[in-house]
Structure formats: C-alpha cells, structure tokens
C-alpha cells in the first residue's frame, strides 16, 4: 500500500503520523495533549492502585488518571498531542 503524503500550504511534503499508543506508565495525566487535540481522539481515564480501570464515580478507588486513545479513527496525524507531552508518552506511525 502507498504511503499517504500531503503537501503543506507552502508546498512542503508532509506525511501524517497517526497516534498508535500511549505509554500509560509514563503518563502523568496532565491533560496537555487532551487540550491540544481538537478532534476528540483522547480521553482521561482513572486507574486504581492495582492498575485496573475504574469509573470516575468511584473516587475513593482512584489512584491516578492517564490518557487513553478513545477515538483512534478521528486522528488526523498532526502529532499535536506528542509535541505538548512532557513525558514523551506517544507513539505515532504513518499509514502504509
């Protein structure tokens, strides 16, 4: 399959890099990536001290929150999330 290549307004070739994964051990749940993404790709989810997902209503069980990929299909490959992440949690790949 061919690689998806776009051209910027200035004529430079650009290959979108789509979000593949978030390293949840490194994620500090700061929300910077969530604010940078205007496409509703990400969601902040809660974990308990055993590393299991918990509902936000169970406040007493929440150990910490981490970012997750909620809607991968909405990613446009801009990598804004990765650029603002202070812990470099993101892995991106081009379409092949």
Swiss-Prot record:
Note accompanying the cofactor annotation: Binds 2 [4Fe-4S] clusters.
Highest rank taxon of the organism:
Bacteria
Question: One biological process GO term for this chain?
Answer: nitrogen fixation
Q: Which SUPFAM superfamilies match?
A: 4Fe-4S ferredoxins
Annotated residues that bind [4Fe-4S] cluster 2 are located at 75, 78, 81, 85
Q: Tell me if Metal-binding is a UniProt keyword of this record.
A: yes
Keywords of the record: 4Fe-4S, Electron transport, Iron, Iron-sulfur, Metal-binding, Nitrogen fixation, Repeat, Transport
Domain (4Fe-4S ferredoxin-type) spans: 18-47, 65-95
Q: List ligand-binding residues for [4Fe-4S] cluster 1.
A: 27, 30, 33, 37
Q: What does this protein do?
A: Ferredoxins are iron-sulfur proteins that transfer electrons in a wide variety of metabolic reactions.
- Name of the protein this chain belongs to: Ferredoxin-3
């Amino acid at each position: 399959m061919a690689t998806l290549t776009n051209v910027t307004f200035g004529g430079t070739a650009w290959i979108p890099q789509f979000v593949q994964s978030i390293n949840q051990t490194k994620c500090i749940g700061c929300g910077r990536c969530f604010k940078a993404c205007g496409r509703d790709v990400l969601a902040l989810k809660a974990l308990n001290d055993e590393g299991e997902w918990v509902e936000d209503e169970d406040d007493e069980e929440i150990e910490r929150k981490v970012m997750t990929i909620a809607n991968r299909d909405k990613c446009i490959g801009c990598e804004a999330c990765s650029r603002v992440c202070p812990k470099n949690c993101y892995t991106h790949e081009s379409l092949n």
